[in-house]
């Protein structure tokens, strides 16, 4: 007879709770992001959406802008989001994605 593996359950974070928290923070910030960076759509994709994130995972975001930002504004957006969320983010622009990559992302993106 083996002892139950209670340590595994106690140390495993609930990834959906993490994703829910990230969604809530982004939704609350979305009006400001739309005004400041002219964002039309913002979506989450990648490991967080699939529930495969680890402690080293960044948050993958897909953004559609009404006006394409210059490099300085793009970097400022990434930094703002990293400060807001407390983790590394990777912001991809819908218009800059290769079609094959865009097709893969569109399968699991969750727009806010």
Which positions does each model-derived feature cover?
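Catalytic core of pol beta-like nucleotidyltransferases
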Residues: 1-41, 49-55, 66-112
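Conserved histidines in hydrophobic membrane contexts and catalytic metal-binding motifs
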Residues: 44
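Short hydrophobic/aromatic beta-strand micro-patches
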Residues: 62-64
């Amino acid at each position: 007879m083996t002892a139950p593996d209670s340590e595994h359950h106690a140390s495993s974070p609930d990834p959906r709770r993490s994703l829910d928290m990230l969604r809530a923070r982004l939704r609350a910030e979305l009006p400001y992001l739309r005004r400041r960076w002219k964002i039309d759509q913002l979506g989450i994709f990648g490991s967080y959406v699939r529930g495969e994130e680890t402690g080293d995972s960044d948050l993958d975001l897909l953004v559609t802008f009404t006006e394409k930002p210059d490099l300085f504004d793009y970097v400022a957006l990434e930094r703002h989001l990293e400060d807001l969320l407390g983790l590394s983010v990777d912001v991809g622009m819908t218009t800059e994605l290769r079609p094959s990559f865009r097709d893969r992302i569109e399968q699991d993106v969750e727009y806010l």
